[in-house]
Amino acid sequence: MHREIFDPGYYPWIELLMNGGGVVGAIFSSLLIWRYINKKKIVALGLELNSLNMKDFVFGLFLGGASMTLIFILLLLTGQLSLKVSLFAPDFSIYSLTFLILFIAVGFSEEIFFRGYIMKTMEDRHNSKWLLYVMSALIFSLFHGMNPNVSVFGLINIGLVGLLFSYMYDATKSLWMPIGYHITWNYFQGNVFGFPVSGTDPHGLYQITTESSAKLLTGGNFGPEGGLLATFFIIAGVFATNMYSKKRGSGSFESKY
């Protein structure tokens, strides 16, 4: 189909500026509100830079990417997914770079607000821990409710991954692990393996087709987040985080500021 000359999807850098500008604006808005309305230090959100937090970040990057890679492999091996090109002929494009930048910004933006700002503000008001988890995950899920091709099961899984991110934040007292997981979960999903990301169009290294009869596993047009495999790996992420945090020697979610 012919694209209009000002269609931003035809110009990846314009698309990045349009989408990324709003995301960066959201980051600064959250930080400014936290600093000047909540009157707290920025690092108190869980953004302190130190070697331990960077290890958390790397673990999050690994866990998010590995989870989505295993979903891809399982669907491929069971015949629920097929490639339009060879696995050894990935299609690198400018989208590989622009969406990496975008998903890095999205990871920071959503974790700073949905985990950092919401949970820490509620904690400062002496809400119970379970309420911190539930409200953060619920608001996170509802935020995605207007996405294209949204499904009830997709929103449930987004709520579940919100709980996982909350647990990562709780277990490490840092945003760095959920930020890392969030970045690679999205990027590997859409820009490596070519799945829709929460219902939005992918620009992957691979073009794929999924079996229409296997929507319960693949998530259909919403992407893997709308399928049972994502549910399994989100739950597995809780156990992986628990094992990691025990080795890390972290305590419970308590403010140091």
Which ranges hold each PLM region?
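Membrane-embedded alpha-helical segments of multi-pass membrane proteins
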Residues: 20-28, 93-100, 113, 156-160, ...
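Small-polar-interrupted transmembrane alpha-helices in polytopic inner-membrane proteins
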Residues: 103, 129-145, 158-159
